[in-house]
Amino acid sequence: MGILQTMFIGFDYGTANCSVAVMRENTPQLLTLENGSALLPSMLCAPTREAVSEWLYRHHDVPTHSDENQALLRRAIAANRDEDIEVLRNSVQFGLASLQQYVEDPEEVYFVKSPKSFLGASGLKPQQVALFEDLVCAMMLHIKLQAESQLPEQIDQAVIGRPINFQGLGGDEANAQAQGILERAAHRAGFRDVVFQFEPVAAGLDFEATLSEEKRVLVVDIGGGTTDCSLLLMGPQWRKRADRQQSLLGHSGCRIGGNDLDIALAFKCLMPLLGMGGETEKGTALPILPWWNAVAINDVPAQSDFYKIGRASCRERV
């Protein structure tokens, strides 16, 4: 029996989309992730929130190293049993398939879009951190399996892009929390070795291949959740250096991205069509907050308040 070879991938775990690439004859090659596309929208769905944790354990033997992950798994199995929910191998869906399933039956499907947006949120309780870790792990595991189905080798090493500042108001603490979630999730998904690279630096490497002399290059990376800028020295003398710290002249990032544009458009253009700005029968202006909570998809408290209203309305109908 031959020895199974292993390899590494470049992994873009994005707020809006995910992609992975491998090196083939010194050239990066994107792998297909969904319906012939190299992009997988950062979405997943399951019958319940708890189904994701049980799916990882029951169908993929994903380990639960921490006490909080183990407690989350026990609660998940008990909750699914109480609701008579059987977690099957295809119970968790990803990308556009998850969106289609959610649209067909929104009241019976647990749907998450852009989980990366929440990783740096302040005030997350340990059980919430454990849940986000499971959500990220499920997506990474799915992507890893999709990639390995196209390769003769197993993948156990990953270079993962990360923004300079994750979304959140906690500064360095938020960045450490978010990267910790990504790193633990990647290890649990089967990546033995995991390293991180600032996304603007990674984006600039492709441009560097076209340079014949050293240049100062400003790289602007506008993503779904963040906008990052880096000023780099680039050129032939830097290409083969593994450590690019000396070439990084400066970097900065803000927690504003494509999701914020989507939120602003939905709030200004869509919410008025759904009643925002209206009045009660007595002529009192309706509060704006419920409509804001509906569109603020990167705000955990706002989304919690919005879905509490939805659940209360469902109970009243029942």
Where are these regions (language model features)?
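Phosphate-binding glycine-rich/basic clefts of nucleotide- and phosphate-handling proteins
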Residues: 41-47, 53, 70-71, 233-317
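Glycine-centered helix-coil hinge/cap
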Residues: 55-58, 95, 103, 257, ...
